[in-house]
Structure formats: C-alpha cells, structure tokens
Amino acid sequence: MKINVNSVKFKVDSKLESLIKEKIEKLSVLYDSILSSDVILKLDNTSTIDNKVVEVRLAIKGNDLFSKKQSKTFDEALDNATDALKKQLTKHKGKVKKI
C-alpha cells in the first residue's frame, strides 16, 4: 500500500511521519484491499489550542473512506482519525460480505 504524507506550510519531522505510516499500515491488517492512503496535516488558523488537523483518505475498491479530526496534537488527531476509519472499514467490510 502506498502512503502519501503531505503537510501544509510546514515540514513534517521523521518521527511523526513514521508514526503516521505505522498507524495507516495497521489499518491494512484490518482490511487488505486498501490501495493507497493520503494523509494531510494542517495547522488551523484559530486562537484555540485544538489547531492541529489531520485528514486521512483511504482509497479502496469502490469508494474512498475519509476522516478529518482536529486536536491539540497531531498524534491525538491521528489516533482519532484512524479510530474513525477502523469503524468505517468494519462497516464497509460487512457490506462487502453481504454482496
């Protein structure tokens, strides 16, 4: 599976990038038909503490799955996004088995 990590207006350090790849690869264990994934990291332009945004798009056969989460840290936002994608993958997997 191909994993693309993009950041908007800042450089991602290697530690965060390796964490992202590790979390996304764990999703492929749950559902093996993931073709690729795009992860976008952004800093929201607000005065609140929760200004780190993580968007994850998984390309699978048929439809793409998407999750966007905002939190205090990129790690926490990534955890929340991958948890949401796990639920979506489980639901999608159930639909595929019914067909």
Model-derived segments and spans:
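N-terminal, polar/charged subdomain of small-to-medium soluble alpha/beta proteins
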Residues: M1-I99
